[in-house]
């Protein structure tokens, strides 16, 4: 049995019922193009292939799993895998114009980076069923006025409908992680609020790095003066004495557009 690489965040699932539960969270797999990150020995890959997808492409960084994945590829003509760094791979380099469903037990040490990268390729994404550390999943789904609500919540919710599916205890994995895990379903939104992305990112960075301060203080460097800031806040239905965690994604989006024109 191969030794697991902690540096790569390797925690695999071998229980078929759990694997099926993950796949069932997707709207549909049969006839769809599927993308998987962190294939390992191919347990999730094999379970997906039994659902008859149009194609499945897996990425695995650890070349020690090449033999197992090559064996799987020999059994299924609609399966391919690549050994490489998922952070460096764009969907458009693996799929042509097809809409892609991403199903993955993500390596927790790069999960957020992967998700934010896919936020820039959503025109090619049908939906995503992803495993996260529970703490990260809670941040993604968090609502305004909650302690977990932050920049990640806003960036994801402006692009996708985020739905928590179920939690998995550490003992489901081999080796078991020290944290509970959560599977999320993320569906790209068809109608999105216009926003100035660079300004929005600056608002989120400034605001949430000083989340306990009133907006009139935390966002003071975004606008030319306090009058402009107060006017912008009034236009989005916010008060200068509010904290940024009280503003919903729509308000923050609109604020970025007003700041752009200021």
UniProtKB/Swiss-Prot annotation:
Homology family: Belongs to the class I-like SAM-binding methyltransferase superfamily. rRNA adenine N(6)-methyltransferase family. RsmA subfamily.
InterPro entries registered for this protein in UniProt: KsgA/Erm (IPR001737), rRNA_Ade_diMease-like_C (IPR023165), rRNA_Ade_Mease_Trfase_CS (IPR020596), rRNA_Ade_methylase_Trfase_N (IPR020598), rRNA_adenine_dimethylase (IPR011530), SAM-dependent_MTases_sf (IPR029063)
Cysteine pairs bridged by disulfides in the record: none
Keyword Cytoplasm annotated: yes
Catalytic activity: adenosine(1518)/adenosine(1519) in 16S rRNA + 4 S-adenosyl-L-methionine = N(6)-dimethyladenosine(1518)/N(6)-dimethyladenosine(1519) in 16S rRNA + 4 S-adenosyl-L-homocysteine + 4 H(+)
Stated role: Specifically dimethylates two adjacent adenosines (A1518 and A1519) in the loop of a conserved hairpin near the 3'-end of 16S rRNA in the 30S particle. May play a critical role in biogenesis of 30S subunits.
Cited SUPFAM superfamilies: S-adenosyl-L-methionine-dependent methyltransferases
Keyword Cytoplasm attached: yes
GO CC list: cytoplasm
Upper classification of the organism: Bacteria, Pseudomonadati, Pseudomonadota, Alphaproteobacteria, Rickettsiales
Domain of life (superkingdom): Bacteria
Chief site of localization: cytoplasm
Protein name: Ribosomal RNA small subunit methyltransferase A
Binding site for S-adenosyl-L-methionine: 11, 13, 38, 60, 85, 105
Alphabetic keyword roster: Cytoplasm, Methyltransferase, RNA-binding, rRNA processing, S-adenosyl-L-methionine, Transferase
SMART domains: rADc
Gene3D superfamilies named in the record: Ribosomal RNA adenine dimethylase-like, domain 2, Vaccinia Virus protein VP39
EC number: 2.1.1.182
Cellular location(s): Cytoplasm
NCBIfam families assigned: ksgA (TIGR00755)
Gene: rsmA
Single GO molecular function: 16S rRNA (adenine(1518)-N(6)/adenine(1519)-N(6))-dimethyltransferase activity
